[in-house]
């Protein structure tokens, strides 16, 4: 298995350290956010149009969840231009600051990189490195 630090470019590691410092203090009131949001946990339902299953609730800022929405949209076209448009649109629709949504999306993509290395998934690794670079 590859070492995560050997796989991630120094520029992205440096950016992650900067983002960690920026995100250490929440922006706004603490809300219940979901630590395990992914498309496998969002299902169509009868009582609601969409239902989030298997939640992992934490207290955090609203931009944390917006960051996930940004990250999954950027996966379809991991370019800086597309990422910028997605960040602006998602932040506006979520009523959160765009810089915070971008920062959380970047950090979640870095987490995906770690998982891809651990799971030895080269395609996922390439995708999430591109997403992180687009959001950096």
Predicted regions and their residues:
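An alpha-helical support segment within catalytic cores of ATP-dependent transferases
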Residues: 1-35, 45-47, 92
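ATP/Mg2+ or Mg2+-diphosphate-binding catalytic cores
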Residues: 3, 111-136
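A general structural motif at alpha-helix termini
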Residues: 16-17, 70, 105
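Short, well-ordered beta-to-alpha junction loops that form the rim of enzyme active sites
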Residues: 35-37, 106
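Hydrophobic residue at the +6 position relative to the catalytic HRD Asp in the kinase catalytic loop
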Residues: 40-42
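Active-site Asp-x-Gly
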Residues: 44-98, 122, 131
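Hydrophobic alpha-helical segments that form the core
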Residues: 104-111
């Amino acid at each position: 298995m590859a070492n995560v630090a050997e796989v991630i470019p120094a520029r992205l590691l440096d950016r992650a350290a900067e983002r960690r410092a920026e995100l250490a203090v929440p922006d706004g009131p603490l809300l219940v956010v979901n630590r395990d949001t992914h498309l496998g946990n969002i299902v169509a339902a009868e009582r609601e149009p969409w239902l989030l299953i298997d939640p992992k609730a934490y207290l955090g800022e609203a931009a944390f969840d917006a960051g996930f929405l940004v990250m999954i949209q950027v996966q379809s076209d991991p370019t800086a231009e597309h990422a910028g448009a997605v960040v602006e649109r998602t932040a506006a629709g979520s009523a959160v600051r765009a810089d915070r949504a971008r920062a959380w999306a970047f950090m979640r993509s870095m987490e995906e990189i770690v998982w891809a290395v651990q799971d030895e998934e080269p395609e996922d690794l390439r995708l999430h490195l591109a997403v992180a670079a687009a959001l950096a």
